[in-house]
């Protein structure tokens, strides 16, 4: 039986790669943390749950379609969400974008009153949707997402522009159209214009603040 005193509220934020999901999640976390304290709110990125590929060569790892639901260990994520809701801590995997696999390290996460979950494929999995108290889809035009992705992956993840463009054409855009964009039908709130939509962020803050009352 779940201990209601530890009941964890899960808020899902989905959308295309480089749509502004992480910016919205980090802004909500930072501003709400100032109000309620770090012990009451946390963020979990879906990227942490990319499957372990340590058994594959680097050549094989780079061929993985990272925008397909099969690239994600949603079974483990689902298990972790259930544990947090039951008042139990989890060991969050740590994923290396350079090595294209999990590292040996984990991050200890204690249950929080509110967990903000963000990632591209969250709403494609019915089990994850069931665990969310409410969900958000960040709806940003693909051309803007591409420009942001090039800047981010080249500057922050050690990628070449050619590799980013090839991946975008082969997997990112097709998988967005096949899986991610259709999943926005499941969102409770759709946020246009990405992470700098201040009005939307204020509305979301007000909604999330209700869970701390």
From Swiss-Prot:
EC number(s) on file: 2.7.1.48
Keyword vocabulary terms for this entry: ATP-binding, Cytoplasm, Kinase, Nucleotide-binding, Transferase
Gene3D superfamilies assigned: P-loop containing nucleotide triphosphate hydrolases (3.40.50.300)
Cellular component GO terms held in the UniProt record: cytoplasm
Leading EC class: transferase
GO biological process: CTP salvage; UMP salvage
Catalytic activity: uridine + ATP = UMP + ADP + H(+); cytidine + ATP = CMP + ADP + H(+)
Subcellular location: Cytoplasm
Pathway: Pyrimidine metabolism; CTP biosynthesis via salvage pathway; CTP from cytidine: step 1/3; Pyrimidine metabolism; UMP biosynthesis via salvage pathway; UMP from uridine: step 1/1
Primary location group: cytoplasm
MF (Gene Ontology): ATP binding; cytidine kinase activity; uridine kinase activity
One Pfam family cited in the UniProt record for this chain: PRK
InterPro entries, A to Z: P-loop_NTPase (IPR027417), PRK/URK (IPR006083), Uridine_kinase (IPR026008), Uridine_kinase-like (IPR000764)
Domain of life of the native organism: Bacteria
Residues binding ATP: 15-22
Similarity section: Belongs to the uridine kinase family.
Protein name: Uridine kinase
Species in which this protein is naturally found: Cronobacter sakazakii (strain ATCC BAA-894)
Lineage, opening ranks: Bacteria, Pseudomonadati, Pseudomonadota, Gammaproteobacteria, Enterobacterales
Gene: udk
């Amino acid at each position: 039986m779940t201990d209601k005193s530890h009941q964890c509220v899960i808020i899902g934020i989905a959308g295309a790669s480089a749509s502004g999901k992480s910016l919205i999640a980090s802004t909500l976390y930072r501003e709400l943390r100032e109000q309620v304290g770090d012990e009451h709110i946390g963020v979990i990125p879906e990227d942490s749950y990319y499957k372990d590929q340590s058994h594959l060569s680097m050549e094989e790892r780079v061929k993985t379609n990272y925008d397909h639901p099969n690239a994600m260990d949603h079974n483990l994520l689902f298990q972790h969400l259930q544990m947090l809701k039951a008042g139990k801590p989890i060991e969050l995997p740590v994923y290396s974008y350079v090595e294209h696999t999990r590292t040996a390290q984990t991050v200890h996460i204690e249950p929080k009153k509110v967990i903000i979950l963000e990632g591209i494929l969250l709403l494609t999995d019915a089990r994850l949707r069931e665990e969310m108290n409410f969900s958000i889809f960040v709806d940003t035009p693909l051309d803007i997402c591409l420009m942001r992705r090039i800047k981010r992956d080249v500057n922050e993840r050690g990628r070449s522009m050619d590799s980013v463009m090839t991946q975008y054409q082969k997997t990112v855009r097709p998988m967005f159209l096949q899986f991610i964009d259709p999943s926005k039908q499941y969102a409770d709130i759709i946020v246009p214009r990405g992470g700098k939509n201040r009005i939307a962020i204020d509305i979301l803050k007000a909604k999330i603040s209700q869970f701390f009352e």
